[in-house]
Curated annotation (Swiss-Prot):
GO molecular function: F-box domain binding
Gene Ontology BP annotations: negative regulation of SCF-dependent proteasomal ubiquitin-dependent catabolic process; regulation of ERK1 and ERK2 cascade
Signal peptide feature range: none
Cellular component aspect of the GO annotation: cytoplasm; nucleoplasm
Top-level division of the source organism's lineage: Eukaryota
Coiled-coil features, chain-numbered ranges: none
Domain Tyrosine-protein phosphatase: 28-176
Organism of this sequence: Xenopus laevis
InterPro entries: Dual-sp_phosphatase_cat-dom, Prot-tyrosine_phosphatase-like, STYX-Interacting_Phosphatase, Tyr_Pase_dom, TYR_PHOSPHATASE_DUAL_dom
Pfam family, one: DSPc
Protein name from the UniProt record: Serine/threonine/tyrosine-interacting protein B
Function, as annotated: Catalytically inactive phosphatase.
Family per record: Belongs to the protein-tyrosine phosphatase family. Non-receptor class subfamily.
Length: 223
């Protein structure tokens, strides 16, 4: 019986030479993948509605901690579909549990021709970690490669050390999850052998991803 081999799409290449990074660009959003934007809350404020509409944004992932809810808000719930996640920018925060929900939200957006903005407060740590995880799992690449890909488009990203550790562990988690999904009942009785590069140690269980934590989905969408 052959081992399960996973296949992934290729990462999109840059259409043109990347723009030189300047400090003010950290206050704007950047397109990381076609239809997927990463940025700070300042890119999603009420004053930026015309920019969001010009870019074709239809979905927004708003990442905030409870104590930030007074100033980080889903400002356009009548225009865009929102996923609001309660995540602290803290090294001990279990961010892996939010990867599945955010990936499903992003996939649902892109598959229907929409465009999504992922933002936290500064667009540097929490939101960047979610985008990196999405790219890792979607394209089957390692943390370092996904980090570099995102940083080439938003230079200021800097996930905290705890998030980096979890992202490094996540490679083994998503590969195991996808492999199990593809295995036949007979294969499930055999030892797991994953054919997609080095996976590292699987210290976290797949249950980490299934714990959704405290999150809220706002789905008010015109039309």
């Amino acid at each position: 019986m052959e081992d399960v081999k996973l296949q992934f799409p290729s990462l999109p290449l840059c259409k043109e030479e990347a723009e030189d990074w300047t400090y003010p660009m950290r206050r704007e959003m950047q397109e990381i993948l076609p239809g997927l934007f990463l940025g700070p809350y300042s890119a999603a404020m009420k004053s930026k509605l015309s920019v969001l509409q010009k870019c074709g944004i239809t979905h927004v992932i708003c990442i905030r901690q409870n104590i930030e809810a007074n100033f980080i808000k889903p400002n356009f719930q009548q225009l865009f579909r929102y996923l609001v996640l309660d995540i602290a920018d803290n090294p001990v925060e279990n961010i892996i549990r939010f990867f599945l929900t955010s990936k499903e939200f992003i996939d649902g957006c892109l598959q229907t021709g929409g465009k999504v903005l992922i933002h936290g407060n500064a667009g540097i740590s929490r939101s960047a970690a979610l985008v990196i995880a999405y790219i890792m799992e979607t394209f089957g690449i390692k943390y370092r490669d996904a980090f570099t890909y995102v940083q080439e488009r938003r230079f200021c990203i800097n996930p905290n050390a705890g998030f980096v550790h979890q992202l490094q562990e996540y490679e083994a988690i998503y590969l195991a999850k996808l492999t199990i999904k593809m295995m036949s009942p007979l294969q499930l009785g055999r030892p797991l052998c994953i054919q997609s590069g080095s996976t590292g140690s699987l210290k976290r269980t797949l249950d980490d991803e299934d714990e959704l934590g405290n999150m809220q989905v706002s789905a008010a969408h015109e039309g």
